Swiss-Prot record:
Glycosyltransferase is among the record's keywords: no
Protein name: Potassium channel toxin alpha-KTx 16.5
Subcellular localization, as worded in the UniProt entry: Secreted
GO molecular function terms listed in the Swiss-Prot or TrEMBL record: ion channel inhibitor activity; potassium channel regulator activity; toxin activity
Domain of life: Eukaryota
Annotated site (Basic residue of the functional dyad): 27
UniProt organism field: Leiurus hebraeus (Hebrew deathstalker scorpion)
């Protein structure tokens, strides 16, 4: 789901998602990170 992390590209979300969900699957959507 969406996490409270601002982003400009999906790479910024990989680390953030790994911290939150343990998964590096994520993308930047509307300047906010979405983790899978």
């Amino acid at each position: 789901g969406l996490i409270d992390v601002r982003c400009y590209d999906s790479r910024q979300c990989w680390i953030a998602c790994k911290k939150v969900t343990g998964s590096t699957q994520g993308k930047c959507q509307n300047k906010q990170c979405r983790c899978y």
